[in-house]
């Protein structure tokens, strides 16, 4: 199991069974690279575990993500990360990263 320091996910599910994990992290700009590195680790796992499966879930893909980064103030960056997937993808993500 891989431990995440910055990403604390909330989970929701749509009527078709697709799940979405949403996380937001606000840090000093000097630490933003650590948040982005953690996101890169999650995305690398997703791509390695479900290769060539990223895309719009409505079009039959297995997983997709959205990433936004904003500077809220000179001393605060906020990163929002959403990761969506099929039930199999969500189960594997939970198991690998120990998510509830």
Task: Cite the ranges covered by each PLM segment.
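Mixed-charge, glycine-accented linear interaction segment located at domain edges/termini
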Residues: 86, 90-100
């Amino acid at each position: 199991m891989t431990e995440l320091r910055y990403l604390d996910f909330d989970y929701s599910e749509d009527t078709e069974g697709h799940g979405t994990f949403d996380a937001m992290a606000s840090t000093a700009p000097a630490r933003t690279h650590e948040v982005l590195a953690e996101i890169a680790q999650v995305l690398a796992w997703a791509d390695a575990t479900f290769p060539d499966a990223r895309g719009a879930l409505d079009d039959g893909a297995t997983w997709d993500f959205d990433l936004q980064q904003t500077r809220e103030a000179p001393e605060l960056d906020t990163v929002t990360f959403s990761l969506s997937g099929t039930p199999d993808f969500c189960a594997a993500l939970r198991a690998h990263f120990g998510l509830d």
